[in-house]
């Protein structure tokens, strides 16, 4: 089990916090004896256990879109196969170690894809960077990511985690908000990866603001194909919010393009938190 944990660790050269100075979320929850999933009496949180919007605080509601129970079962099956493949077939009484191994193992078995086909170039129109967005993320780890709608003061915010936008996802979203809807904000799935979003979703579900949360170092997210599609195909004014001043954000921050396609770019500076006020 220690070997699995060590294999899942990202080296200090790749991240600022190493294994000696940080812990997985699951370990912190276990150590501090924080009760999990109280709104479902300890059961899994998925679209099967929270059918309707749930009031988590006064006038604040949450509607869970995914994962489905099928996604959770597939994740469990893959986890077991990975453990067997590493000759791990014995019982571990140390719950903290097992929790840590589970999280690190999921990091290791995530699918990896080829880099985007378009390279940043100063010439031409933004539309030339739009991709077909037809390839789909097949990672069950990402499919099992929690996605939900947060609602407050008649405003809805769509948080997509690392979710995969597929037919099941669109069907569930349609049941909650209808065939089309304009959100106050959408957190892009999987840091803006082109494998996790579709043109159909972009056309049907728009927002005042789109959030792209990544430093772009590990997988070079977001994909320019995704950003170009969001900007060019949604004609309403929108803001693309980046928490880091990444190259693709700087590339899109062109006055000519912003005027033509009715958008603005907001970038963080790594030191200060970006705050959004919708009151």
Protein language model annotation of sequence segments:
Residues 1-155, 239, 243, 255-279:
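Flexible, acidic/histidine-containing loops and adjacent segments that form or flank the divalent-metal
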Residues 70, 194, 218, 248:
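Surface-exposed, flexible loop/turn segments at secondary-structure boundaries
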Residues 35, 57, 85, 101, ...:
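A sequence-composition feature that detects small, non-aromatic residues
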Residues 163-185, 200-205, 220-279:
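C-terminal regulatory/interaction regions
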Residues 72, 157, 248-250:
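Short, surface-exposed beta-strand/loop "edge" segments at domain boundaries and coil↔beta transitions
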């Amino acid at each position: 089990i220690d070997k699995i944990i060590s294999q899942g660790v990202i080296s200090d050269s790749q991240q600022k916090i190493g294994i000696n100075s940080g812990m997985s979320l699951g370990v912190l929850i276990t150590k501090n004896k924080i009760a999990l999933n109280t709104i479902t009496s300890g059961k899994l949180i998925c679209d099967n256990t929270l059918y309707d919007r749930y009031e988590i605080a006064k006038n604040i509601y949450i509607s869970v879109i995914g994962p489905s129970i099928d996604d959770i079962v597939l994740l469990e099956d893959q986890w077991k196969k990975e453990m067997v493949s590493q000759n791990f077939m014995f019982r571990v009484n140390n719950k903290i170690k097992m929790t840590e191994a589970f999280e690190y193992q999921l990091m290791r078995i995530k699918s990896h894809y080829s880099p985007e086909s378009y390279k940043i170039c100063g010439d031409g129109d933004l539309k030339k960077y739009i991709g077909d967005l037809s390839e789909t993320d097949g990672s069950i780890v990402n499919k099992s990511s929690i996605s939900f709608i947060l609602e407050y003061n008649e405003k809805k915010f769509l948080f997509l985690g690392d979710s995969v936008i597929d037919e099941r996802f669109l069907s569930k979203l349609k049941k909650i908000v209808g065939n089309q809807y304009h959100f106050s904000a959408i957190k892009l799935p999987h840091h803006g990866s082109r494998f996790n979003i579709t043109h159909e979703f972009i056309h049907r579900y728009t927002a005042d603001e789109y959030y792209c949360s990544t430093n772009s170092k590990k997988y070079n997210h977001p994909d320019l194909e995704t950003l170009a599609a969001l900007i060019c195909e949604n004609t309403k004014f929108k803001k693309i919010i980046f928490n880091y001043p990444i190259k693709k954000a700087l590339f899109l921050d062109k006055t000519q393009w912003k005027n033509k396609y009715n958008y603005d770019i907001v970038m963080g500076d790594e030191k200060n938190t970006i705050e959004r006020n919708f009151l």
